[in-house]
């Protein structure tokens, strides 16, 4: 294992630290898994497949079909060394009218995602996870598809992890290429909407007790090519590092509520930052808090953070205020939910000489605002009532009507890539537009699901006066996971 760590580029000190931390541990993790920063696990499955725990299926008596056997393939007679195989096949069709919000022929994307992973466990304390992916795309009016949509084969993840227990503290470290989702979804996400997911390279380490945690990381993004594995490299221009804390709110404070508070301090460096047609080095710091969880029938996800630093010769002074909440209209878990989200992302200075007040998410989940990728939390104010219901245990319907404005009319409207809609910085009307969102998810089984999505973006004056127009987005996809 130490040889493998060195092959992946770990320093000798890291090798020794990870090996030492693996000497004492317990099967059960101390900190609640739902808030440990690895994403949500539902029905045994997680978007990040390494976050799944299939140890129970090492007992053949608990398997219900042949696929279950792939979750624990023993490599030693004792079963201390075993491998968990995982995979996904997703077929998807996107239809977008007026792509890029220009009056132009509709775009159709026929997309294929194939993913295969192997999680090798060496006892309770060491593991190696490897995952490869293929992205295929065809259709019409495609332009030049990004490497996250078209890629013959990519090493999507490859890391080694060691974990253990020191007294009453779980400690661990993960080194290599990995998905990172430890933070608010609108700020950090593996971006499942892509065919090839967003991954980063480097070190993440943690220490956790039953009621608090600390996670530290130093990561660089993967820069994908569109051919084979050899052109998927570590991006030399960008670096993301920081510390996130986590605290479990005592249940007695709010009548048994499951609430968590995560303060964070991050730094993002980019040698080729771009605002207002200017390119230059940028260093941005984030200091904020993420509060989330359930209190009775109410679910909340709130984030406040201040951003500062420099872009070229400009000082950065920006804010994110992100609030999502809903209430369950009944006692059962399947009862309808009614809620709203209200978000503020400051703007201004992208085309000026004063302070740069445009908020910026490191690599957030932009489909939250628009599957057409027409909006991002920079110079943006949104308010959206939301509703979801499950008329049957396997069908989930949801709807939202989102109204959007610019926070600063002297700056542009920005799309998901962070690029501006050219010319919008010269329009002095705040209204961006409205987005109607409808979605249906039919879960035939934990492994198989079918999703349909429709959106209509009704362009407002900020867009139409700069020559942009409205758009419809319609998509359907089927996903099989094992």
Question: Which residue stretches match the model-derived regions?
Answer:
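N-terminal periplasmic/intermembrane-space "pro-region" immediately following the signal or transit peptide
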Residues: 2-5, 14, 20-106, 123, ...
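Extracellular/periplasmic loop regions
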Residues: 36-54, 60-64, 277, 303, ...
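Surface-exposed loop and membrane-interface regions of Gram-negative outer-membrane beta-barrel proteins
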Residues: 58, 95-112, 121-168, 186-189, ...
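Membrane-embedded beta-strand positions of outer-membrane beta-barrel proteins
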Residues: 85-87, 130, 173-175, 205, ...
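Residues on the lipid-exposed face of transmembrane beta-strands in outer-membrane beta-barrel proteins
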Residues: 87, 114-120, 157-162, 203-207, ...
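Outer-membrane beta-barrel pore domains and translocons
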Residues: 88-92, 133-135, 176-180, 219-221, ...
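Signature for the C-terminal beta-barrel architecture of outer-membrane proteins
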Residues: 166-171, 187-352, 410, 423-427, ...
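Predominantly the C-terminal beta-signal and adjacent terminal strand-loop region
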Residues: 444-477, 481
């Amino acid at each position: 294992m130490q040889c493998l760590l060195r092959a992946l580029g770990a320093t000798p000190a890291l090798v020794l630290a990870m090996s030492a931390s693996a000497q004492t541990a317990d099967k059960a993790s101390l900190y609640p898994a739902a808030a440990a920063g690895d994403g949500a696990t539902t029905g045994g499955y997680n978007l990040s497949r390494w976050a799944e725990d299939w140890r129970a299926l090492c007992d053949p008596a608990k398997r219900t079909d042949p696929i279950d056997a792939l979750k624990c393939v023993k490599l030693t007679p004792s079963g201390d060394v075993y491998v968990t195989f995982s995979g996904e096949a997703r077929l998807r069709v996107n239809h977008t009218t007026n792509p890029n919000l220009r009056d132009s022929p509709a775009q159709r994307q026929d997309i294929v995602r194939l993913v295969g992973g192997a999680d090798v466990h060496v006892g309770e304390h060491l593991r190696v996870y490897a995952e490869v992916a293929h992205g295929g795309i065809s259709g019409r009016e495609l332009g030049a598809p990004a490497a996250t949509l078209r890629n013959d084969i990519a090493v999507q993840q490859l890391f080694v992890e060691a974990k253990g227990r020191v007294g009453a503290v779980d400690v661990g470290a993960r080194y290599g290429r990995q998905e990172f989702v430890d933070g608010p979804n609108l700020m950090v996400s593996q971006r499942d909407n892509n065919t090839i997911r967003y991954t980063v390279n480097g070190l993440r380490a943690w220490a956790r007790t039953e009621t608090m945690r600390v996670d530290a990381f130093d990561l660089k993004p993967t820069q994908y090519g569109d051919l084979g594995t050899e052109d998927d490299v570590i991006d030399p221009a960008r670096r993301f590092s920081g510390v996130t804390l986590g605290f479990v709110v005592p249940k007695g404070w709010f009548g048994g509520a499951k609430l968590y508070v995560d303060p964070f301090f991050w730094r993002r460096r980019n040698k080729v930052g771009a605002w207002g047609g200017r390119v230059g080095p940028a260093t941005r710091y984030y200091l904020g808090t993420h509060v989330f969880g359930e209190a009775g029938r109410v679910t909340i996800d709130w984030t406040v953070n201040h951003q500062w630093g420099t872009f070229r010769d400009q000082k950065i002074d920006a804010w994110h205020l992100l609030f999502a909440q809903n209430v369950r209209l009944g006692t059962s878990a399947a009862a309808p939910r009614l809620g709203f989200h209200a978000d503020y992302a400051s703007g201004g200075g992208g085309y000026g000489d004063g302070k740069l007040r445009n908020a910026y998410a490191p690599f957030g989940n932009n489909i939250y605002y628009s599957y057409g990728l027409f909006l991002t939390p920079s110079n943006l104010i949104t308010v959206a009532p939301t509703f979801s219901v499950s008329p049957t245990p396997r069908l989930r319907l949801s709807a939202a009507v989102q109204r959007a404005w610019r926070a600063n009319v002297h700056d542009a409207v920005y799309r998901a890539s962070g690029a501006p809609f050219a010319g919008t910085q010269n329009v002095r009307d705040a209204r961006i537009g409205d987005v109607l969102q409808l979605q249906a998810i039919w879960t035939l089984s934990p492994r198989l699901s079918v999703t349909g999505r429709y959106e209509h973006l009704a362009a407002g004056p900020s867009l139409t006066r700069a020559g942009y127009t409205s758009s419809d987005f319609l998509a359907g996809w089927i996903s099989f996971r094992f």
